[in-house]
Amino acid sequence: MQSNRTTLMWASFLTLVAAGVGFATRAASGPAWASEFNIPSSTFGMIMGAGFLGFGVFIFLGGLLVEFFGYKKLLLLAVILHLLSAVMLFVAPTLHAEWEESVGIELATKNTVSLLYWSVFLFSVCAGLYEAVINPLVGKIYPENQTHYLNILHAGWPGGLIVGGILAACFQNDTAWIVKIPWHLALTTYAIVLVVLLLIVIKESFPDTVSQRGNVKVITLFSCFASVPFLVLIVMHALIGYMELGVDSWQTRLMENLVDNSVVVLIYTSFLMFTLRFFAGPIAHKLNPIGLLFVSSLLAVGGLLWLSTEIGSVLVIFAAATLYAFGKAFLWPTMLAVAGERYPQSGAVAMSALGASGMLCVGFIGAEMIGVQQSDATANYLRENHVALYEEFRAPEKKSFPSWGGRFNLSLFEIQELAADKQQATMNNSDDPNSATIKAAFDFGSRTALKKTALIPCAMAVGFLLLLIYFRAIGGYKVIELEASEQGSG
């Protein structure tokens, strides 16, 4: 047993807290970016999507690197790069002002979008390296109950969302509870957690990885990909990433007009997730991990469909958010536990492959798709009900999806969206005679996006049901010990 495993658990926990703080404050920055830089919902979604692209690539590459370079070196690299991403955010307003003077507002906005995009991308690279280290590390130092301790570890993510959400509610946007501060100050607060984390990692010793401990062949690390159930798990985790992280990216923005300060909904659901993840072990022992995933998917469907209805009561909004939180709480960490318990011979590779699929899906498709669905439905509402306002507010150019498709001459479809700065300014000005109509259109778009997203956990439920049937057919879900795993697993 690793003598300092509690300290290592805390260090691992703090990586997710830092990521959660950055994510929550960034998710609440949409109104500020729309007003200050004229960034529309679709572009905001693209930037938020960058917060998953680097994660998806580097959690998988990190899974390979950690096997051969060890936990400590990779974790130190991630913390340093994470601090650099905070610096990029901090200087964005200053650089935008300088660019506006030198090259004009249009190029200044374009350059600022690029700076924000690459800062968020670097943030996601670090998050990917964190996950590549901490998931197999916690699985290794707590082999007796991986589902329980991986869920506790991943309580750090909603814990960070709570801290970041409170910061956003108190200090971001016009609805700030205490005082509105510049958005870049709020967004860089995660650097405080990183300094504490850096001090812990420097002085602690870490255990060896699977590859460092013995003469393990590379082909053994990749043997999980020869298992059909594992390939199904990859698809399921991609859908989990789309649903959980895609909706989290948009939750604050989508509920902007439903409650006085929409960040409180994110804080509330994050608090529920934080609490629930400490009780995953006993629940998983009763249902088994696959059963827990199946039930969670069904609850997520109900929660999203409820949130997508026209709700007039704040209490009902929180009730629907409660159901959704119960649905999503156990999905991500329990999937990682299944990878660790069923494919121990693959070390960090199996867990990293699942994490990569989730992040790549939300990065390339999910976050932007939800934004596109919201923008499209908002514009359609005006076009069908208020033609004159639609003509007044519509953006001069159509938006292609996916935004990165233009680089490869690939565009699945185009939408007509509204001009972001004009839309946001009208919604913020209650004296504007068009404010109520634009808010109604925005709310309709938000509900439509949530309703369409509910199809994702529907597909997840079908997949987990098939896995339940499979494991029952082979005698039930069993944890595979590393010594016995050389013969392969299913």
Regions found by a protein language model. Give the residues of each.
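Extracytoplasmic
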Residues: T7-I39, N135, V247-T252, G366-A367
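Extracytoplasmic gate region of multi-pass secondary transporters
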Residues: R26-G30, S223-M273, G363-Q373
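Central cavity-lining transmembrane alpha-helices of secondary-active solute carriers
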Residues: G49-L64, I267-A280
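Low-complexity, proline/glycine-enriched hydrophobic segments characteristic of transmembrane helices
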Residues: E98-V103, E368-A454, E486-G490
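Hydrophobic core of transmembrane alpha-helices in multi-pass small-molecule transporters
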Residues: E100-Y130, V316-F330
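Helix-loop-helix hairpin linking two adjacent transmembrane segments in secondary transporters
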Residues: E144-N145, I152-T209
